[in-house]
């Protein structure tokens, strides 16, 4: 019996955060035995916001090395760089012709980013969700892990796929209609200084973010200064409505140690101050990240191995993507290349 196909991508823009790890990359490693996994470093998506070429080049290699360091196995999964598989851009253009302007103008992420990057509101940023649809539909993905900021894009991908199937192949659909992948444990990683906002690797205030490659001393310092509350006496309790800062730190501690919230609450019952708890959270995060960082540096220095991973991943992805694109071109009426 074939495994369900999953596709997920990571952007090589900015340093990846512990939010990226706990919310996505750790799932990637855990899903490999039960799913047919397609994992992609989405550099084509990254340039919808202006990038420094040298920084993008290095960030792409960094992201690939991090994927490998957290446990993505190229023998179990297909790991590739998006721009190495031209079918993504080819299908993306074609799907533009089956997407309405009104659909894209309603995308909240476009509204948010166009406000943030007001001097560079480009067509690529507007059509970002269509390229994401192409990423998904090329591989016949059954499930797509998505955060709250991407759910709307997945809905659009479903609409585009349904529309195309209804026009050209209602009896024998070309595109699989993807479903969201809902993890059994959902890591909620929020800003360290404002726990009402999601931790973002692109946050201008670096006190809000812990990166995967962050120096241990910096991690400890940021956790020590993280938001808590002024409740007297102090109370360690998981309560997002009333204790968002503490709940955020508890989530990080739970993710790093495997302890349940109930166990954490019991451990710190009757604390006189939040300092010892913060100290333990910082040390637990350092311990969680140390082996990942060591493996990352080992892999990053082995460019020959990385090149081989990229080459094999692109070959595997292209073979599958080309089959889908050929079917699409045929039903649309394109003349095949002799």
Curated annotation (Swiss-Prot):
A motif ('KMSKS' region) lies at residues 198-202. The keyword Protein biosynthesis applies. Gene3D superfamilies: HUPs, Tyrosyl-Transfer RNA Synthetase. Its main location: cytoplasm. L-tryptophan binds at residue 135. A motif ('HIGH' region) lies at residues 12-20. It is an enzyme of class 6 (ligase). GO terms for biological process: tryptophanyl-tRNA aminoacylation. One of its GO terms (cellular component) is cytosol. It comes from the Bacteria. Homodimer. This is Tryptophan--tRNA ligase.
